[in-house]
């Protein structure tokens, strides 16, 4: 099984032959990036402990009513949005008809299935048969506007690859101008990496 959901600690462990990509949900609405690296068979670490550990350097108070030690700005949000929480470069930035440019995407639900959907009008990875790939779709929603974002993670376990894509659903009843919408941000917590970038 390439994607393992742990109901108890609300984590998704996406596993290839040699790597793990781990995402978790805290406070029922915040989707966090927890780990990407060497394969981990089971992930049982307390998410709140990790979030507080990464809190060093935060300069504003907590915005979580039930947990004064958590600060949105210090969390490694899986899909950061402009104007909210994560202070790094956002993956998503939209402008609404009323002039607002702030989006707060909350975790809604998930679904896991065999196979990978095509991306209409765009080139993308594919599998010869559905058994070669497993996909996790996570739905996020802005409670104020109704805008939905679906994050897709397709795990090609035998090929050591995870293909990510994002689908944006405008359910706001208004025109929305997308200023930025990228498929992924990945936090690298260890500094011992070599980065190779191919322009084109």
Where are these regions (language model features)?
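Gly/serine-rich nucleotide phosphate-binding loop at the start of the catalytic core
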Residues: 21
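Contiguous, structured surface segment used for ligand recognition
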Residues: 24-26
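Polysaccharide-binding surfaces and accessory modules of carbohydrate-active proteins
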Residues: 10-13, 31-200
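Short, Gly/Pro- and small/polar-rich lid/capping loops
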Residues: 1-11
């Amino acid at each position: 099984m390439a994607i393992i959901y742990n109901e108890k600690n609300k984590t998704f462990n996406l596993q290839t032959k040699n790597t793990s990509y781990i995402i978790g949900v805290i406070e029922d609405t915040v989707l966090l990036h927890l780990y990407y690296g060497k394969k981990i068979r089971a992930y049982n670490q307390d998410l709140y402990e990790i979030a507080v550990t990464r809190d060093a350097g935060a300069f504003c108070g907590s915005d979580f009513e039930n947990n004064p030690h958590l600060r949105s700005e210090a969390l490694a949000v899986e899909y950061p949005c402009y104007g909210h929480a994560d202070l790094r470069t956002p993956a998503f930035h939209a402008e609404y008809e009323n002039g607002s440019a702030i989006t707060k995407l909350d975790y809604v639900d998930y679904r896991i299935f065999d196979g990978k959907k095509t991306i209409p009008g765009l080139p993308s990875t594919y599998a010869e048969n559905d058994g070669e790939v497993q996909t996790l779709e996570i739905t996020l929603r802005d409670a104020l506007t109704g805008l939905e974002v679906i994050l897709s993670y397709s795990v090609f376990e035998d090929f050591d690859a995870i293909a990510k894509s994002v689908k944006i659903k405008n359910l706001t009843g208004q025109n929305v101008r997308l200023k930025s919408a990228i498929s992924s941000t990945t936090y690298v917590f260890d500094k011992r990496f070599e980065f190779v970038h191919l322009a084109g």
